[in-house]
Amino acid sequence: MEENLYDEFGNYVGPEVEDDEEEEDEDFLGGLDDDRDERARGDDEAMDVDGEKGADRSIVLHEDKKYYPDAEEVFGDAEALVQMEDTQPLTEPIIAPVRSKNFDLLEKKMPDTTFDFNFLAGMMDKPALIRNICFLGAMHHGKTLFMDQLVMNTHERDWKINKEVRYTDSRQDEQDRGLTIKATPMSLVVQDTKEKSYLFNVMDTPGHTNFQDEVIAGMAVSDGVVLIVDVVVGLTVHIERMLKHALQEKLTVVLVINGLDRLIVELKLPPTDAYHKLRYCIEEVNELLEKLYDTTGAEVESRTYFSPLKGNVLFSSALFRMMFSLESYSCIYADTHPSAKFDTKQLAKCLWGDVYFNADTNKFQKSPPDADQPRSFVQFVLEPIYKVFAHCLGEEKEDLAETLKEIGIYLHKKDYDLDARSLLKIVFSHFFGYGGGLPAFIDMIVEHIPSPKENAAAKTERVYSGDQEGSVATDMKALDRTGYLMVQTVKNYHRPDCNAFDVFGRVMSGTLFRGDRVKILGEAYSLDDDEDMTVREIQNLWIYEGRYRVEVSHVPAGNWVLIGGIENSIKKTATITTASNEEEVEIFRPLRFPGSSVIKVAIEPLQPAELPKMVDGLRKIDKAYPMVKTRVEESGEHVISGTGEIYLDCILHDLRKLYGDLEIKVADPVVEFCETVVETSSLKCFAETPNKKNKLFMVAEPLEKGVGEDIEKGKVRIDWDARRVSDFFTKNYDWDLLAARSIWAFGPDNNGPNVLVDDSLPSEVDKAMLKQSKESLVQGFQWATKEGPLCDEKIRSVKFKIMNAELSDDPVMRGGGQIIPTARRVAYSAFLLATPRLMEPVMFSEIECPADCVAAIYNVLSRRRGHVVRDLPKPGSPMYVVHAYLPAMESFGFETDLRTHTSGQAMCQTMFDHWQLVPGDPLDRSILLRPLEPAPAPHLAREFMLKMRRRKGLSEDVSVHKFFDDPMLLELSRQDAELSGYF
């Protein structure tokens, strides 16, 4: 039967057979057909709805077929970039990681404190309980360690006893260098001996001379200064200069004698010698005060001096965390002998000076009862401290425990296993009570430093440039928190990401609220020119605490504040007032610094494409450092000017790591120069305006010594009335009254060291017409003194006299476009005919070294055109102090050279002091400079000028044809054949 089912070829020819698999296939295919039908129906419906937007039935070529949707269809609003090749360098990741700068040492969370921050904010409304103070001292005199005692006693944390915290050194490079770079404020609630709370706003400042700008900014917002002096080192020139500035600002000063432990451990002085050293240190400071009072012209009634008997002197050892005054030490005796019931204030008066204790009568007397009787300070103050040191350093644990019990000090057993320094810290913290005697410091500040309300009137007179009788100044003098809002800003602090800055300042009157719209007045703002003014909204307000911030809603008058959201409108300092203030508000005076930024370097990015990033970084550098100057030369190079090598080193570090995040190339450092004259112009110079309708005549001559410095220091101001200005010059420099009344301007700005005088005669010049052109003449004069003809450096100590002026009757013909460049050109010609010279900055160097290193210092200085002013021993120590002058051009690497020749025993501090003439004639073309050979002294001026001109992209030599008209050249050739070598 099966044979009938197949043909002869084996093919199946029988009946159809039902197959389950075929049914499944049919079901599957049928389902697909159903889906196609449904999609087709859907497409038909869509076509019906969309009309012309339906599916296109036209034939599509293979190469035009679209197999995948476009990126815009898939990702919507996202931007899609298509690149045909990989242009990203291998060193750069495809997806860059999120970078966080961990340069600042910040608190990860709000620290625990002994006070509540709401309580602190409440105390801001009580100006009588506020003290704004600034720490002042030389480098390594213990300011930051002293600040640590305030921080440790107000912040609850497990502070490591064997480690110095240096809490206000909140930058990583400050910790690495062991050097404070930035002034850091902190606001703390502290208690005095009566447990009364006060709000202390404290500014810890750098001690290095290069960072004096930070100290000046700190003093600008303070009412008093805490002068911290190391008892071994004593006074330094940096302290002298900063103390002079504090007295000029009418700030109250108190004294802290630090380093008491050094007399015992390092110098190993007997107690009697230690007393004499302490007394000498105080007398040295008082002698300096006497000299500064005479210099500043302070009234005799307002002069205060330091004495432990007055309570304005504190003795301290910041390393061992102890401090005391005479009164606080007498309180220790009162607590130790409660049965005696003596007056602590009376006892304190007997603990200083030539006072002795008579054991037989139990009384103090002026004469010693015995020949070897020590003074009361030695017997009752120093000897107990010496004994504590001796027992802690020399006794075994068991004996030391018994000794300490006798004076009421009980320690844990584990404390005796600590090293000697840590053990002494713990012992002294028990010996002097809470905080190692911190209430003694609080008492001194509260008693001697005025509150913001008490000092408001004096502060306003010093910092406000407006009318002192106006309503704005009246509110500031009364510290009226409901009056006009006035805020003085002095510093800018970057945020942790270094992309933005917050502005730090002091509220002088009114109350600053978050969300206020305020007017920001820049340093160039005036009532006549309001261009430097913007309106912004306050986004954030903080109390700045060094390593963390406390946000607040408002800050009343008398307090310090950190402001967020307005930094784009502020370069250095600014004045902030309410936007709705309709009063005529003038600015707070910009900060004035005793030194100058004379060291400069030229920089450029390693990758030229990163130039915009570097320029943005330079803007941030300009905000972060008060004394830095950044500018672009005509050659296109970017120049940074600073006070010294370490100052510039910190700036370049911040530019690379924080603000620019790029690699830069740095040129060799150079210095700023000035141009001056040493004689009067050989003839009356003249220049014609381009339209040949006006002619100006001028001569130049040297300015009297000291005039330029007085103008720069603000002792005389051009905005005074004419009588006041003339009185200054007639009384101080013997100017005749006519010349003093004829002063028109200072240059290159209103505080510049050059003077423009109208010396023309009314019989020769139409004074009314000349006065109409005064503004243009002044602008030309200031332009000329800003960029001198020798090498585009500032002109200094030159008096320019307008001798005559032939002016057109038509005002259009004598407009600013004609007069300004002509005034500049005639000033240049008068300058070049007055024997021009170059001036270079000279640095003052204070060198501390052992006596056997003094000879090596002389040798190092002699090779750098320097000379020693004096060298003298430091009393009570084995050190010598050498004072020397050194040209800034020769100061690069001086400190390294000095330490090399003294085996690291010498330490120096260098700062700008004055300007001096560079030897030689810069216009002497007979001088030939040989490459790779040092130029002799008479050739230095020529060498400096040529190298500066080459660096700035100027022509090789000064072109006289550029500054002299043809008639003037003919006059010169006839007048003096000796000048022919210049043409």
Where are these regions (language model features)?
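Conserved GTPase G-domain signal focused on the G5
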Residues: 142-143, 319-330, 437-445, 452, ...
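Accessory interdomain/linker segments of ATP-dependent helicases and helicase-like nucleic-acid enzymes
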Residues: 370-502, 509-512
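Accessory interaction regions appended to the cores of large information-processing enzymes
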Residues: 275, 297-302, 321, 330-353, ...
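Short glycine-/polar-rich loops that comprise or flank the Walker A/P-loop
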Residues: 221-224, 249-253, 309-311, 598, ...
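Conserved Switch II/interswitch segment of TRAFAC-class P-loop GTPases
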Residues: 197, 205-211, 219-271
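Intrinsically disordered, low-complexity N-terminal segments enriched in charged residues and glycine
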Residues: 1-130, 135, 179, 185, ...
